[in-house]
């Protein structure tokens, strides 16, 4: 064994549930993981439910698997916490039983958002100024939907919390929340790091369902005998307040001080900038969330489906390349990057149309497409198209970062790049060239769960603070310096792409094509 003390983080992600065990030096010891799906509710367009009964059973198995793989006694786990996708909520009755749950991008409340904007035309901007959130993925429209469509559940609702909080409720029986994830509900003060129940009251919703708030790294209870029997964790193990996946992931990457910048490249890409104030964007283009570090807010741009688009491209169009990669014994993405590396900057003029830059107040995207393809197979090869997708994700990230830098006044010469996309050497170099900034790749596989272990360690006195341990344990793998000539070329590509994207949005507006995704109420 590496140490006698261990910490366990539950990670309720978009695509899977996980339980990850770390030692006190931040070394990953084991992981239990199962994929899950968040399915639409029959007859409810754009819904994405959270099946808390099924998903709790999955998490039970993940915890048992992680403990078994670690080869340790459950009593060696000195604290347990949880993180999750953000925006998702769970509602409870007066006895603490779950009533209703939705996952992060549930967009069922289309009519309700339109109603709120009509009846309270200034409320969204007013609420954004206080919370950093719009109605796009907010809790209030979802509660209004429940009130109008499932009144029997709404009347029974006595409490709510976020999905990461829910996992801790299952362990401890305590219904509580914390700023980083509750902050994504849109009913939470950036400045005061507390609920804003008056928002709910203003639009005619219950204002007494918001639970106590504790900062990340606070012990809120202990593992109950029931939860112990279900999970294999020792009864009495401290249950520690965790946080939202992106903010705890930032801690796991060492992005914990004002002015630091990160890009997280997963299914969605997030562009994150730490700032020392609760400032919001006058243009309402960018969301702002509480960090897990008190005193820091995090401006966040979001690029939709960058990772998912890559998977679609691989699976739908690259069967031959996947077969060749398998024959060579390498990852298919690595082989596609090899092909893309032979293509010049700008990908022979190919313009991918997928995610727009972020416009949080009017958040929607054009129909997916590739523009400006050539019928010359050498110019529009699979490698060229793949490179165009990598360049496009970097360009949209750059545009979001520019928006953030403009309203925050923050500037930085470097970007911490993490997530699956950061494994690609070409993609990392493209991000450096597009942004004109040094790109640093940390040595960490499970940054979000690692951030959770920091919270556990603070709670039991192993570490003095999340920020301090994050800085002491972060290690760097690689760094990429920008090429100034490529930077200039990418500025031209970005301008062409913006004009092309505007034209594609007009087709959506005219009903000719279908938006890849749009927020409720648009």
Predicted feature locations:
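A short acidic Gly-Thr/Ser loop motif
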Residues: 10-15, 83-85, 243-244, 264-268, ...
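Conserved ATP-utilizing enzyme core subdomain
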Residues: 18-20, 173, 330-369, 520
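Glycine-rich phosphate-binding/catalytic subdomain of phosphoryl-transfer
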Residues: 46, 61-328, 516-517
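Glycine-rich phosphate-binding/hydrolytic loop that grips phosphoryl groups
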Residues: 114, 248-252, 303-305, 311-314, ...
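Activation-segment/catalytic-loop signature of the eukaryotic protein kinase fold
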Residues: 344-441
């Amino acid at each position: 064994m590496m140490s006698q003390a261990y910490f366990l983080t539950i990670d309720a992600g978009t695509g899977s549930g996980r339980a990850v065990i770390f030692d006190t030096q931040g070394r990953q010891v084991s992981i239990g993981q199962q994929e899950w799906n968040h399915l639409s509710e029959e007859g409810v367009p754009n819904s994405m439910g959270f099946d808390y009964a099924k998903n709790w059973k999955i998490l039970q198995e993940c915890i048992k698997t992680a403990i078994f793989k670690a080869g340790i006694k459950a009593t060696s786990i000195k604290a347990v916490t949880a993180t999750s996708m953000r925006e998702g909520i769970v509602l409870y009755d007066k006895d603490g039983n779950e009533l209703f749950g939705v996952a992060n991008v549930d967009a069922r409340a289309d009519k309700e958002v339109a109603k709120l904007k009509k009846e309270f035309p200034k409320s969204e901007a007013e609420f954004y100024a206080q919370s950093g959130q719009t109605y796009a993925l907010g809790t209030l429209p979802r509660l209004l939907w429940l009130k109008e469509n499932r009144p029997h559940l709404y009347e029974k609702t006595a409490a709510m919390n976020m999905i990461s909080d829910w996992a801790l409720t299952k362990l401890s029986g305590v219904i509580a929340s914390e700023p980083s994830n509750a902050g994504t509900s849109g009913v939470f003060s950036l400045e005061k790091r507390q609920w804003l129940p008056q928002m709910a009251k203003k639009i005619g919703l219950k204002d007494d369902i918001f639970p106590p708030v504790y900062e990340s790294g606070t012990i809120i209870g202990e593992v109950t005998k029931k939860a112990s029997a279900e999970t294999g964790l020792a009864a009495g193990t401290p249950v520690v307040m965790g946080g939202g996946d992106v903010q705890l992931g930032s801690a796991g990457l060492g992005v914990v001080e004002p002015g630091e910048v990160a890009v997280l490249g997963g299914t969605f890409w997030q562009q994150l900038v730490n700032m020392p104030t609760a400032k919001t964007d006058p243009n309402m283009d960018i969301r702002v969330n509480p960090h897990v570090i008190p005193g820091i807010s995090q401006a966040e741009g979001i690029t939709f489906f960058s990772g998912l688009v890559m998977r679609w491209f691989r699976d739908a169009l690259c069967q031959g390349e996947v077969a060749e990669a398998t024959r060579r014994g390498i990852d298919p993405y690595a082989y596609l990057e090899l092909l893309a590396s032979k293509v010049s900057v700008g990908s022979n003029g190919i313009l991918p149309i997928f995610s727009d830059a972020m416009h949080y107040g009017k958040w929607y995207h054009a129909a997916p497409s590739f523009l400006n393809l050539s019928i010359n197979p050498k110019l529009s090869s699979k490698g060229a198209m793949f490179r165009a997708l990598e360049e496009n994700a970097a360009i949209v990230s750059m545009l979001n970062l520019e928006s953030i830098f403009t309203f925050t006044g923050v500037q930085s010469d470097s970007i911490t790049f993490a997530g699956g996309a950061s494994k690609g050497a070409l993609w990392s170099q493209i991000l450096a060239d597009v942004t004109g900034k040094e790109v640093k790749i940390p040595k960490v596989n499970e940054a979000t769960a690692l951030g959770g272990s920091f919270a556990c360690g603070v709670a039991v006195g192993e570490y003095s603070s999340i920020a301090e341990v994050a800085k002491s344990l972060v290690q760097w793998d690689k760094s990429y310096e920008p090429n100034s000539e490529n930077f200039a070329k990418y500025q031209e590509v970005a301008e062409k792409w913006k004009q092309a994207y505007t034209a594609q949005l007009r087709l959506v507006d005219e009903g000719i094509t279908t938006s890849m995704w749009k927020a409720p109420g648009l």
